[in-house]
């Protein structure tokens, strides 16, 4: 078992934290906004660890669902499950254990949060199979990656206001943007094996669609900032996020594989500076109030 542990870590992408960070930033945005910038630190820890566990479980299930496809894709052919280094039942078992541990984390929270976690588990578990049926599975991914948003509001406020769903919509558009960049890397392989992705669905309009999704995401956050009366600290973070999106255009405009992958990875910075702007606003507002 210990000898296989490094393989299990690769299966759940512990060597590639970018996915966990892309889940974490929107969840932190929600926690800070829901609590007016004063989230309880145990709650932050629960959601941060839960995000890591559920992303890891999702990776295991994704590899299980795609095991017959991944061997035909150069980038994924050496994954532990695809290459036969671990067995299919091991991936399912790991996903189940991680999901169970994540559920244990939220047991101290209110009933609504636990009920939403069941929905989140269903969405996360079913996402890997959407690529067979749905022309833009990245939109479904956005729901899966963003379900920490309504859960965060539920945990803090005991209800899920309209603002939480608006933030979830923003996350869907952001996910379509960055995961289309990711899908552009595998475009040729996906055509060959018949998997549906937004990069194929958008076709020659892929770059335009990505930039439109960034515009909608940042437009929604601008509306949130204006509605909630956020100050200059937020707008500085928002402007930095806009700069990141414009930088991504320079990377993806020629549709080359490695620059597209670099744009995908750079979304960590976009999410990070946007959260930094939100957190900084509450920090400045709190200092001014004192």
Curated annotation (Swiss-Prot):
Keyword tags: Cell inner membrane, Cell membrane, Magnesium, Membrane, Transferase, Transmembrane, Transmembrane helix, Ubiquinone biosynthesis
Membrane topology: Multi-pass membrane protein
Gene Ontology CC annotations of this record: plasma membrane
CDD domains found in the cross-reference section: PT_UbiA_COQ2 (cd13959)
Segment forming the signal sequence: none
Reaction catalysis annotation: all-trans-octaprenyl diphosphate + 4-hydroxybenzoate = 4-hydroxy-3-(all-trans-octaprenyl)benzoate + diphosphate
Localization per Swiss-Prot or TrEMBL: Cell inner membrane
Keyword Transmembrane among record annotations: yes
Protein's pathway: Cofactor biosynthesis; ubiquinone biosynthesis
The EC number(s) this enzyme carries: 2.5.1.39
Alphabetized GO MF terms: 4-hydroxybenzoate polyprenyltransferase activity
Transmembrane segments annotated in the record for this chain: 41-61, 89-109, 133-153, 158-178, 202-224, 269-289
Swiss-Prot/TrEMBL GO biological process terms: ubiquinone biosynthetic process
Named cofactor requirement(s): Mg(2+)
HAMAP family: UbiA (MF_01635)
Family: Belongs to the UbiA prenyltransferase family.
Role summary: Catalyzes the prenylation of para-hydroxybenzoate (PHB) with an all-trans polyprenyl group. Mediates the second step in the final reaction sequence of ubiquinone-8 (UQ-8) biosynthesis, which is the condensation of the polyisoprenoid side chain with PHB, generating the first membrane-bound Q intermediate 3-octaprenyl-4-hydroxybenzoate.
Protein name: 4-hydroxybenzoate octaprenyltransferase
